[in-house]
Amino acid sequence: MTKSTVALTLGDPAGIGPELVAKLLAKQNIREKANIVLVADKDELEKGMEIAKAQFVYEEVSFHQLGQYEFKTGVPVLISHKSSHPKPFEYGKVTEQSGVYILETLKVALNLAKMGYVQAICFAPLNKQAMHKGGLRYRDELHWFAEQTDFNEFVCELNVVDDIWAARVTSHIPFKDIVPNLSIKGVFDCIHLLYRSLVQAGVENPKIAVQALNPHGGEGGVFGDEEMTIIQPGMEQARKAGIDVYGPFPGDTTMREVERLKINGVVSMYHDQFSTALKILGFERGVTVQGGIPIPITTANHGTAFDLHGKNIAIPTAFEAAFNIAVRMGQGVLNQK
């Protein structure tokens, strides 16, 4: 079977990203799972290896050489990218120069995917404040990725812990705005997006649970009717599309139903509704997937940890999980061709 090719970036070099990449690629079994293309400042990569006390062999190639390059098992390649910002990096803090570098390396990785050189992208933790200083015009990277890929359909952040995936109909909005932003189409789109992502990650016939909005699932309209007027009609559309969907389940019993029914994915109505339980289940193993974007893109579900830069105490568990999902989804892209 042909291996997928994954682009890997350092995220924000002022944080723990370079250390995490070094620790990840020091593992031979990781390097052999996929063909790996590092998009990074060579000096920052080497600093990460020095911090982590972790070494691995890589080969340096240019962007245009990659199309004819024959990968060697367990040997990543590096496309070295120097930031266009004139100032050097300042470690352990939010800076414009880090933000510029983050956006530039992600653009290179996206271009690799557009050219068909890689099937997925995994980036080390980045900092949104730095990215805004560096030119990001969107509230988060998800909508920036949508712009960069000319994607105008529904997108949402997916959270993953172990074998449980989660999506949400609404996300980074005030609590008072949740109900006005719920719709039958939104519920269906979210279910459908989660279903497609699970299939791309190699899950056959995924089971998806949907959460109710109101206490006790609305109690037949006594505590609210959104379950009847919005959520259930959206679920019915999903069933007609051939998706195996269950619920709507009250928020406080959803995890029990996930375990009982062996659910693969959960659709919630708002940001913290299911992610709280998911993070309790395994915060240190959490992964974020940029849901809906035509290129599979993953990262660890934690931040840059500026205070840990240079200390060699960053734990790579979540980043390794993110890389593994990128490999699986990249394989799904190959299998679709």
From Swiss-Prot:
Role, per record: Catalyzes the NAD(P)-dependent oxidation of 4-(phosphooxy)-L-threonine (HTP) into 2-amino-3-oxo-4-(phosphooxy)butyric acid which spontaneously decarboxylates to form 3-amino-2-oxopropyl phosphate (AHAP).
Bound cofactor: record note: Binds 1 divalent metal cation per subunit. Can use ions such as Zn(2+), Mg(2+) or Co(2+).
Residues involved in a divalent metal cation binding: 172, 216, 271
Record-level GO BP terms: pyridoxine biosynthetic process
Additional detail: The active site is located at the dimer interface.
Principal subcellular localisation of the protein: cytoplasm
Name of the featured protein: Putative 4-hydroxythreonine-4-phosphate dehydrogenase
Source superkingdom: Bacteria
Cofactor: Zn(2+); Mg(2+); Co(2+)
Keywords assigned: Cobalt, Cytoplasm, Magnesium, Metal-binding, NAD, NADP, Oxidoreductase, Pyridoxine biosynthesis, Zinc
GO MF term set: 4-hydroxythreonine-4-phosphate dehydrogenase activity; metal ion binding; NAD binding
Catalytic activity: 4-(phosphooxy)-L-threonine + NAD(+) = 3-amino-2-oxopropyl phosphate + CO2 + NADH
Cell membrane keyword on record: no
The protein's annotated pathway: Cofactor biosynthesis; pyridoxine 5'-phosphate biosynthesis; pyridoxine 5'-phosphate from D-erythrose 4-phosphate: step 4/5
Pfam families on file: PdxA (PF04166)
A GO-annotated cellular component: cytoplasm
Family: Belongs to the PdxA family.
SUPFAM superfamilies in the record: Isocitrate/Isopropylmalate dehydrogenase-like
Subcellular location: Cytoplasm
Record-listed E.C. numbers: 1.1.1.262
Complex formation: Homodimer.
